[in-house]
Amino acid sequence: MEYINTLLALTGVMMLSVASPGPNFMIVTSTAVASRRAGVITGFALGAASGTWALIAIAGLGLIVTHVAWIGTALRIAGAAYLIWLGAKMILTARHPLNAPTLVAPSGWTAAKKGYAVSMTNPKAVAFYGSIFALMVPAHAPAWFHVAVIAIAVAVSSAWYCGMALLASHPAVHRLLMRRKAVLDSVVGGLLIVLGGRMLAAR
C-alpha cells in the first residue's frame, strides 16, 4: 500500500510539472501549428524523454549531479545552447508562410528528434527529476515499482503534450494561430532565447 500511495503522489507531481509552461509546451504547440501529426509525434517524443529522465533519476541522477559538479554545468550549457539555436531559427523563419516551397511541415522523424532533444536539454527536467522526483522514489523499491514509475512518467507526459498538440491543431484554434504565425513563432523563439540566456547566466 505504501508503494501505491507513492505512485499516486508521483503521478500528481508529474501532472503539475508538465502543466507548467516551459520549453516543452512551446515546442509542441508551435509544431502542431504546422502539422497536427508532427505535433502529436512531438508529444510522444516528449513522453519518451520523460521516461528517459525517470530512468536516469532512478539510477541516481541527483547524487551524480551533486557530487560531480561539471556534469551539471555541462548539461546546463548544452541545454542553453540548444534553446538559443532553436529560438533563433524560429525567429528567422517566423514570417515564412507554411505553404511556401522553402518551408514544409516537419517530418515525423524531425518532430520526434526535436521534441526529445528539447526535453532532454530542458533545465526544468534536470531540476525536477534530479531533486523532487528522485527524492520521492524509495531507495530500495522493488523492480515493478521502478517500471511503474517510468510508465507513469511516459503516460502523463504523452497524454498532456499530445492533448496540447490536438488542441493547437483544432480547426478553430489552428486558424487563429495560423493568422498569428509570425507573432507566435517570434514570441516562442524569443522566449526560448531568453530561457537559454538565463541558463547560461545561472551559477
Labelled PLM ranges:
Residues 92-110:
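Flexible cytoplasmic inter-helical loops of multi-pass small-molecule transporters
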Residues 2-73, 131-148, 152-153:
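Juxtamembrane transmembrane-helix termini in multi-pass membrane transport proteins
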Residues 67-96, 156-164, 175-203:
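Selective transmembrane alpha-helices of multi-pass membrane proteins
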Residues 45-52, 112-125, 184-188:
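Select subsegments of transmembrane alpha-helices in polytopic membrane proteins
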Residues 8, 12, 105, 109-117, ...:
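Alpha-helical membrane-protein architecture signal
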Residues 55-58, 121-130, 188-203:
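Hydrophobic alpha-helical transmembrane segments in multi-pass integral membrane proteins
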Residues 15, 19, 51-52, 88, ...:
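Hydrophobic/aromatic residues within the transmembrane alpha-helices of Major Facilitator Superfamily
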